[in-house]
């Protein structure tokens, strides 16, 4: 059955919490032919290392905390295993997506990288997180910037 939500365009990315991004990337390289030379980006502001690649048209992020009490390390410790941390849904209108979710009882979660609630600028677009997990998976909405907006929000790179 297909969703009738006209605001959701599709999956922007899926983020996996891993203990070791390099090791996890090695498994994806062996089993799914993801290029082994995929770069692992370091994000000093949020203190994460992230291997980013595309598979089947979907962006995958293998996210490793650089500190023991970091966002992804805590998530792994709470659950006792690595796994799918969140799915980011690309939306046409983030305010409409949030209004719909909140009308259905959803609460907003603080963005752990920015310490902000609700819609706010991020490197690729406006984002917001729901506090309510769906089957143990966090939900993120992103309204991707237009090319003009991308230049305007260049300062948010590296979060």
Name each model feature, range by range.
Residues 1-25, 84-91, 147, 152-159:
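N-terminal beta-strand motif that seeds the catalytic metal site of vicinal oxygen chelate
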Residues 2-5, 18-26, 30-36, 52-53, 61, 79-159:
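Vicinal oxygen chelate
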Residues 11, 15, 28, 53, ...:
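Short, structured motif recognition centered on aromatic/hydrophobic residues
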Residues 27-31, 38-47, 67, 143:
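An N-terminus-focused feature that recognizes amino-terminal "leader" regions
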Residues 34-55, 59, 131:
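N-terminal strand-loop-strand beta-hairpin
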Residues 62-90:
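Helix-adjacent hinge/juxtasegments
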């Amino acid at each position: 059955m297909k969703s009738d939500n006209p605001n959701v365009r599709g999956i922007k990315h899926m983020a996996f919490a891993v203990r070791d991004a390099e090791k996890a990337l090695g498994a994806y390289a062996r089993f799914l032919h993801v290029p082994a030379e995929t770069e692992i980006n370091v994000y000093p502001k949020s203190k994460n290392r992230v291997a980013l690649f595309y598979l089947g048209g979907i962006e995958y992020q293998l996210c490793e905390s650089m500190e023991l009490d970091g966002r992804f390390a805590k998530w792994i410790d709470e659950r006792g295993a690595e796994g799918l941390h969140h799915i980011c849904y690309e939306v046409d209108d983030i305010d409409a997506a949030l209004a719909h979710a909140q009308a259905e009882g959803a609460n907003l979660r603080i963005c752990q990288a920015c310490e902000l609630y609700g819609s706010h600028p991020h490197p690729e677009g406006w984002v917001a997180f729901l506090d309510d997990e769906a089957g143990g998976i966090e939900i993120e909405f992103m309204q991707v910037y237009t090319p003009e907006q991308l230049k305007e929000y260049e300062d948010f790179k590296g979060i």
